[in-house]
Amino acid sequence: MSKVLSAVRGRVTAASYAAAWWLVCRVPESWGRWVFQQAGEIAWRRQGAGVQLLEANLRRVVGPEPSGKELRALSRAGMHSYARYWFEVFRLPVISAERLVADMRCEGKDRLLGTLASGRGAVLPLPHMGNWDQAGAWIIACGVPRFTTVAERLKPESLARRFFAFREGLGFEVLPATGGVQRFGILAQRLRAGGLVCLPADRDVTGGGIEVDFFGEKAHMMGGAAALAVQTGAALMPVTLWFDGPLWGAHIHEEIPVPGEGTRREKVAAMTQQVARVFEAGIAEHPEDWHMLQRVFAADLDMARLAAAQATARAAEEAEGAAAAAAGGAADGRSAADRAALNGRGGGGALDGLADGADASEGGSGP
């Protein structure tokens, strides 16, 4: 019975998203924006698990001093921001490149474009802030012909195909997080060719992430971006995003250099910690635009489940390395240890949707 209900729910979810894409692109923008804001308000008032986790995460950001009422006001703004993200995702296919460029306020754009123009690749780790899909469409509109990212394969499969097609239609190259694709090898190839790779990195969805200090607590984050920078020599440039009134804001931060000393693992860990520090500053400046409705801090995690996930991740790495060795090596000719360094195979986070924001559990923070 549970499988039947799950299948029915999956079909309903896929149909809902298809309808949203069709409708939002056809109704007046002001109407659609109002509807999504109301949906965000309803989700916030329901105080489901997702909103409660959002408030728990925001408490780490703002500290103990703000009252419960002030924290609730912040989470309310956060759910409205999350609703705006979803509205804009559905609206992106009809937003012109001219508007994407005109309405973006970005610090550090020339830094990134200069790096790419020199022929050097760049890997951009980013948190689930603002509108990361819009930011991707914006960089394409700025003249970058294409960039590569990784996303989880959503369920049902029809929804996964739709999201892959949506992002590919915007100019993204999307690699599935599962399915036997040699992701690290492909990403490394793109970077060595002077390409751009963007990887959401503020939450470990694999169990194999790097432990970092984050707002004074332990958390696990994706280390794949740092591993790629160490492996390929690409520039590691963290990005933070936010909503700037009706416009969009972004900051492409200065490159995090590879440490001169230490083992490969130690270098990746140190660079990932620096990424976390950049994320801290960006989130603290715009906490309402951090759409983290899931557990991210170690204190909130089920440690038994985390240990099981880590064991699964290690087994997957070993299996992938053995398979690649049997086949003569990975796509980029790296060793099994190098390929295993891309610990955060996901990168994109599983789809929650705005409605699930009121009752989220262990899913991701967005597609």
Predicted regions and their residues:
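Membrane-anchoring hydrophobic helices of lipid-metabolizing enzymes
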Residues: 1-126, 160-162, 169-171, 319-324, ...
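Non-catalytic C-terminal accessory region of glycerolipid acyltransferases
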Residues: 3-8, 43, 64, 76, ...
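Soluble or luminal CAZymes and related metallo-dependent hydrolases
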Residues: 15, 50, 104, 179, ...
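A conditional alpha-helix N-cap/helix-loop micro-motif detector
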Residues: 102-105, 129, 156, 177-181, ...
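Conserved beta-strand termini and adjacent loop/short-helix elements that scaffold enzyme active sites
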Residues: 107-109, 150-152, 177, 253-255, ...
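Catalytic core of membrane glycerolipid acyltransferases/transacylases, capturing the structured
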Residues: 118-179, 193, 207-210, 214
